[in-house]
Each structure stands twice: as structure tokens, then as C-alpha cells.
Amino acid sequence: LLITPTIDLNTAQASARDDRIAAWNDGMGNEWRVELPAAVKGAARIAIEPDHMPPSVRAYVNGLVEAQKLEAITPILADMRMIKSEQELQLARHAGQVANAMMTGGRAAIADGVPEYEVAIATSQAGTRKAAELLAAHYDDADMSPNTHFLQIMASGETITKTHHRATTRVMNRGEPVFLCFCGMTNFHRFKLGFDRTFWIGDIADETQADVYEVA
């Protein structure tokens, strides 16, 4: 049973691998709660993922089902998720290709006199184009977007120690370090990768930075 907002019903019907789809609207009847009593009625045990449930849903389920009938299935699902099919492995490799394209595009855009946001634009464009290429060659999901998204995490010069700093209008200068992080924005076909790299523009102006980098 898939319970979805009415506004997303068409998408659910086109994409979901489920023969039971129920739609609901804000403020109409009992909203998303309508289908749940019948769905759990008579069940001896009900598996849930406690840490993945919205508080309102968890509270409703707690009032609907006796506590002794609820069982956390997260450990079992976590083990299952560690087993990858050939299709999933291919997806991971393709996500890696998108990641490499983003890093290559970002590195090529780094230069003396260039503002940080130009690097962010370059990484997004490079990743999107590689993703589009892979989608066209290997996948038949017409609704899957190739666009990468999320704000680019990067820092340069004196801001280098701000780990989750976003790309700004700051102009980068020769000799400065430039940190690029792609955690959260390197995504392909719902598969995400996280990694980062540090570069310097030309020769390193402060040699102690190289020593710190070697330790890290």
C-alpha cells in the first residue's frame, strides 16, 4: 500500500511498483490516516523503521497498534541494503563517473581572479552533462532528471577552515588553497556519493599549509 498526496497521484501511478495506491488531501477527512486502520487490522506483528518515521505518523501508529506488536525492522533492512545487485553496482559506478566529471569541471574553473560561484556553476554543469549522457545511454526512465543540485560546498583562502562554507562572490587568488566538497550534491539516479578534494592555485603561498595537508 502506497499512501500519497493527491497532487502526486499521477506520478505514483506511473512510477510505483505497487498495485495499491491511496491518495489523500490536506484538510479532507482523516487525510493520510484513512487507510492505516484497515492495513494493520489483524496483524500479529507490524514492522516499522522508528527513526525514519515522521513524528506525526509514529504518534498515530502508536495509538493505533499495541506496543508489543510493533517491531523495528531497521537492522534487517540495513543488512539487506548491504547486498548490491549488478544493476545497483552499475548505478554506483555511473554515479562515480558523474562525481569525477564534477571534480574535473570544478578544478578546471579554479584560477587566480575567479569568484567562487563560477566554480560552483562549472561543477553543476559538468555533472549534469555527464549524467544526461549516462541516462541516455543506459537507462529508460524518462522522468529521471540529470540535474545535480544542492549548494556547492567550497572554501578558499582565509575561509578554508570553514568546513561547510558555500560558494560565494569571494575572488580566489594565486597561492591560495581551494577546498571542494561534493557530499550531498553528487547524485545520479537517486544514488549519492560523498567526497572532497583540496587544490592550490599555482605555487603554495604558505608552505605550512602543505605540511598540514600531508598530515590530513
Language-model region placement:
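Active-site neighborhoods and metal-handling regions in enzymes and metal-associated proteins
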Residues: L1-A216
